[in-house]
C-alpha cells in the first residue's frame, strides 16, 4: 500500500514536471508559423539543424540560431550559413524578437514589408537583396541599429524614417539614387550613418543638425554647400562628391588627433584628386624657411626634369592601376557570391540586453574581408534589337507569373457573369480561383489593335506594376498576353470598397479612429509611389471605389501604375471610362486637361478629397444634392476654417468623438491638399508627416477622454508595440 502511494506521488511529480517544462518551452504558435515560412523561403536548408516545415518547438528543441526568453523568440542569428532564397513574408509575427542577423549569406529578393515590429537590431548586410527599404520601417519604433550594406538595393530612398529612435544606420555599398528624404532630419538619436558608395544626389542639409559622431558619405553625387556643423563630427568621410566650395572658403579645423574607429579609411587622401573639388586639405603643419635664389637655367633644367619624371610616374601609375583593376575584376568574377569590401558597421559590440529580456546576448558585426568590391558595369539593352519580333524577344516582368489564357478561363469559369465583380475604366473585373486554391482578381483590358511600340509600352507598364510592394497597395500576381488578350491577375483583397463602407447604410458608421487609419494608409501608399520610383508613379485615378478594405479593414489601393494604359484601350472601354469619369468629377483637380496635369499633384488633390469624404461622410460628387452642394470640395472649402461650420459638417456618426483642435488640424491638411493652384499643394510625404502628428495628438487626447472609450480604433493607437494596430473587424458594422 505504501509502495503504491509512493508510486502515485512520484507519477504526480513527474507529470507536473513535464507539464511545467512544456508550459515553459512551447513556442508561441504565430512565431512557429513565421519560422516555418522563413525555412520554406530559404529552400529548406540542411544547415538549419532542428528546423521543420511542420510542427516542432523552436524554443524547446533549440533550433539552430534561435534564442528564447520563456516561450518567446528574442534572438535570431543566421549569419554566415550560406543560405539561399528569400526572407518570406511572415517576419512581422515575431513580436518579441529583438535581434535579427542574416548577414553574410546569399539571400535574394526584396526586404519583407513586414519586419519584426519590436526589433532593436537588424543586420542584413552582405547579401543580394533588391528593391529598397520597406515603407513599414516607421512602425519599428524600438529600432536602434539597421545594417543593409553590401546589397543590391536600388532606387530613391523613400520618406520612411519618421518617428524612429535609431542610433546606427548603414546603407552603404548599394545602388541607391535620388535625394535624401526630409525624414532624415527627424533622426535626432542617430550617431553613426554610412551612405558611401551609392549614387545619392542633392543636398545633405537634412544631416546638419543630427548628433553624428560617425558620418561616411563618400563616393556619391551629393552637391550644394557643406554644412558647417560637419567639422564638429569626430569621424567624417565626405570625399568623392560634388560639393560647392567658394574661393574664399575658410579651411576647416579637422580633429586630426582622433583616429577613426571604423570604416575603410586610414587617413586623409594622399592626392587632391581624391578629395572633393576645390575643398581645402587640412594643414597639419606650417613651416617657413628662407631659400636661396636659383638661376633661370637651373630653373629650366629643374622644371624640365621634374616634368619628365612626373610623366614617367604617371604612365607607371596608370599601368599599375589598370592591371590592379583587371585583377580585382577577375577576383570578383570568380567569387560572385562574396562581397569584397571593408566593414561599414562599427567594430563595437551592441549592448542590447535589457531588464525585460536578460537572456539576449550581445552581437558583434562581421569582421572585415580584405578586398574592396568593384561594382559591375551597367548592362545596356539595345531596344532596336527586340523590334524584330515582340512575341519572341519581349522581356516579361520577372516579379509576376505568366498565366496562359486557358488557365484564367478555367479559373473564372470562362469569365462567367457570376464571377463578374464590376466594370472599371480599364475593363471588366472577375473573381478567379487559381489551381492552388487561392482566390484572385482578373482584370480583362480590351485593347485596340496595338503596334509593336504600344505592345512594348504595355510590357513596360507591367514591369513597373509588378514591382510595387506595399502593405496598402493591391499586389499584381501575374498576367496573360495571348491571342490579343491582355489580362492582369491581382491578389484578392475582398469586395468591400471604401465607397461602400462609407456610403452604404449597412456599413455605417465607420469610427473616427478607423477613418484616420485609412487616411494614413492611403497617404503612405501614395508617398511610396511618388518617392520610391524615378520618375515618380502617379496613380491618376484615386477615389473611394479604388480603395479596398481587407479582412482587417486595412486600406489597399487598386490599379496602381496603370494610368498610362488608358490611351491603349478600345473605343468601347474609353466610352465607358468617360462615363465613369463624370461620376468621379469630385476627385478631379482643377488643372485637369492641361499638359502635364495628370501627375503627383493631382494625386495630392484627390487625397484631400478623400480626407474630406472621411470627415463629412458625403460623396465627392452627389447629383442628388442641390446644385451648390454637389461638388464636395466646392461646398466645404469656405467652411473648413470656420469653427461652427466645421463642427456642423462633421459626419454625425463620429461627431463628438474627437476634439475641435484635432478637427481644425485635420481641416488644415485638407485645405493644403485641395489648393486650386497645384504649385501650392505639398508633396504627399508632408501630408504623411502631418497625419502622423495628428494621430499622436489624438492618442494623447484619447488616453484621458471618456468619449473615446466607445471607439476601439482610437484606443488601439495607444499601443506601445506599433504605431498602428490591425482593427477589429466588427467596428465598421457598429450601430
Curated annotation (Swiss-Prot):
Residues 319-735 are cytoplasmic. The keyword Cell membrane does not apply. It is found in: Membrane. SUPFAM superfamilies: L domain-like (SSF52058), Protein kinase-like (PK-like) (SSF56112). GO terms for molecular function: ATP binding; identical protein binding; protein kinase activity. Glycans are attached at residues 118, 128, 147, 175, 189, 264. Residues 415-695 form the Protein kinase domain. Pfam families: LRR_1, LRRNT_2, Pkinase. Expressed in seedlings, roots, stems, leaves, flowers and siliques. Residues 24-297 are extracellular. It comes from the Eukaryota. Residues 1-23 form the signal peptide. Disulfide bonds: none annotated. Keywords: Glycoprotein, Leucine-rich repeat, Membrane, Receptor, Repeat, Signal, Transmembrane, Transmembrane helix. Residues 358-378 are annotated as: Disordered. Disruption phenotype: No visible phenotype. The chain crosses the membrane at residues 298-318. GO terms for cellular component: membrane. LRR repeats lie at residues 78-94, 96-119, 120-140, 142-163, 165-187, 189-211, 212-232, 233-253. The protein kinase domain is predicted to be catalytically inactive. Belongs to the protein kinase superfamily. Ser/Thr protein kinase family. Cannot functionally replace STRUBBELIG. Over-expression of SRF2 led to male-sterility in cv. Columbia but not in cv. Landsberg. This is Protein STRUBBELIG-RECEPTOR FAMILY 2.
Amino acid at each position: 500500500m505504501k509502495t503504491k502511494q509512493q508510486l502515485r506521488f512520484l507519477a504526480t511529480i513527474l507529470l507536473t514536471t513535464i507539464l511545467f517544462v512544456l508550459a515553459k518551452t512551447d513556442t508561441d504558435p504565430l512565431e512557429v508559423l513565421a519560422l516555418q515560412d522563413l525555412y520554406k523561403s530559404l529552400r529548406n536548408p540542411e544547415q538549419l539543424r532542428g528546423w521543420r516545415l511542420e510542427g516542432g518547438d523552436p524554443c524547446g528543441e533549440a533550433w539552430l540560431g534561435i534564442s528564447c526568453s520563456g516561450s518567446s523568440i528574442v534572438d535570431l542569428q543566421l549569419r554566415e550559413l550560406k543560405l539561399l532564397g528569400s526572407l518570406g513574408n511572415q517576419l512581422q509575427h515575431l513580436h518579441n524578437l529583438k535581434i535579427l542577423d542574416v548577414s553574410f549569406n546569399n539571400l535574394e529578393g526584396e526586404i519583407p514589408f513586414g519586419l519584426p515590429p519590436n526589433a532593436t537590431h537588424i543586420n542584413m548586410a552582405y547579401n543580394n537583396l533588391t528593391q529598397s527599404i520597406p515603407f513599414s520601417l516607421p512602425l519599428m519604433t524600438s529600432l536602434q541599429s539597421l545594417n543593409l550594406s553590401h546589397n543590391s538595393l536600388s532606387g530613391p530612398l523613400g520618406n520612411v524614417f519618421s518617428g524612429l529612435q535609431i542610433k546606427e544606420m548603414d546603407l552603404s555599398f548599394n545602388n541607391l539614387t535620388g535625394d535624401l528624404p526630409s525624414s532624415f532630419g527627424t533622426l535626432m538619436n542617430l550617431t553613426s550613418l554610412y551612405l558611401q558608395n551609392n549614387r545619392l544626389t542633392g543636398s545633405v542639409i537634412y544631416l546638419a543638425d543630427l548628433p553624428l559622431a560617425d558620418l561616411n558619405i563618400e563616393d556619391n553625387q551629393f552637391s550644394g554647400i557643406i554644412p558647417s556643423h560637419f567639422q564638429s563630427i569626430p569621424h567624417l568621410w565626405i570625399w568623392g562628391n560634388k560639393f560647392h566650395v567658394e574661393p574664399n572658403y575658410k579651411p576647416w579645423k579637422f580633429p586630426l588627433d582622433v583616429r577613426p574607429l571604423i570604416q575603410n579609411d586610414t587617413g586623409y587622401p594622399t592626392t587632391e584628386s581624391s578629395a572633393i573639388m576645390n575643398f581645402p586639405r587640412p594643414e597639419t603643419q606650417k613651416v617657413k624657411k628662407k631659400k636661396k635664389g636659383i638661376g633661370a637655367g637651373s630653373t629650366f633644367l629643374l622644371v624640365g626634369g621634374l616634368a619628365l619624371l612626373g610623366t614617367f610616374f604617371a604612365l607607371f601609375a596608370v599601368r599599375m592601376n589598370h592591371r590592379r583593376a583587371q585583377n580585382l575584376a577577375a577576383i570578383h568574377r570568380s567569387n560572385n557570391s562574396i562581397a569584397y569590401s571593408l566593414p561599414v558597421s562599427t567594430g563595437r559590440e551592441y549592448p542590447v540586453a535589457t531588464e525585460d529580456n536578460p537572456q539576449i546576448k550581445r552581437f558583434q558585426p562581421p569582421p572585415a574581408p580584405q578586398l574592396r568590391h568593384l561594382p559591375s558595369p551597367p548592362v545596356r539593352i539595345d531596344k532596336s534589337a527586340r523590334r524584330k519580333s515582340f512575341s519572341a524577344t519581349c522581356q516579361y516582368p520577372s516579379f509576376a507569373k505568366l498565366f496562359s489564357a486557358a488557365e484564367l478561363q478555367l479559373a473564372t469559369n470562362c469569365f462567367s457573369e457570376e464571377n463578374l465583380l464590376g466594370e472599371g475604366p480599364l475593363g471588366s473585373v472577375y473573381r478567379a480561383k487559381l489551381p492552388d486554391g487561392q482566390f484572385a482578381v482578373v482584370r480583362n483590358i480590351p485593347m485596340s489593335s496595338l503596334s509593336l511600340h504600344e505592345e512594348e509600352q504595355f510590357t513596360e507598364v507591367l514591369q513597373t506594376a509588378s514591382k510595387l510592394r506595399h502593405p496598402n497597395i493591391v499586389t499584381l500576381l501575374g498576367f496573360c498576353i495571348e491571342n490579343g488578350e491582355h489580362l492582369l491577375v491581382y491578389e484578392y483583397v475582398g469586395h468591400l470598397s471604401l465607397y461602400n463602407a462609407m456610403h452604404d447604410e449597412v456599413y455605417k458608421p465607420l469610427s473616427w479612429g478607423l477613418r484616420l487609419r485609412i487616411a494614413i494608409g492611403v497617404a503612405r501608399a501614395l508617398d511610396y509611389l511618388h518617392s520610391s520610383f524615378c520618375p515618380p508613379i502617379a496613380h491618376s485615378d484615386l477615389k473611394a471605389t479604388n480603395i479596398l478594405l481587407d479582412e482587417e479593414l486595412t486600406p489597399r489601393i487598386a490599379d496602381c501604375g496603370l494610368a498610362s494604359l488608358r490611351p491603349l484601350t478600345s473605343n468601347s472601354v474609353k466610352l465607358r471610362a468617360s462615363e465613369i469619369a463624370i461620376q468621379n468629377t469630385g476627385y478631379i483637380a482643377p488643372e485637369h486637361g492641361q499638359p502635364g496635369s495628370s501627375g503627383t499633384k493631382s494625386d495630392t488633390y484627390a487625397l484631400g478629397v478623400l480626407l474630406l469624404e472621411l470627415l463629412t461622410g458625403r460623396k465627392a460628387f452627389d447629383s442628388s444634392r442641390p446644385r451648390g452642394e454637389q461638388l464636395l470640395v466646392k461646398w466645404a472649402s469656405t467652411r473648413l476654417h470656420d469653427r461652427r461650420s466645421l463642427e456642423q459638417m462633421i459626419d454625425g456618426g463620429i461627431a463628438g468623438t474627437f476634439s475641435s483642435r484635432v478637427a481644425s488640424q485635420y481641416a488644415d491638411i485638407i485645405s493644403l491638399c485641395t489648393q486650386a493652384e497645384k504649385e501650392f499643394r505639398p508633396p504627399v510625404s508632408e501630408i504623411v508627416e502631418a497625419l502622423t502628428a495628428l494621430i499622436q495628438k489624438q492618442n494623447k487626447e484619447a488616453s484621458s477622454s471618456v468619449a473615446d472609450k466607445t471607439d476601439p480604433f482610437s484606443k488601439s493607437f495607444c499601443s506601445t508595440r506599433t504605431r498602428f494596430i490591425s482593427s477589429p473587424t466588427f467596428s465598421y458594422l457598429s450601430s
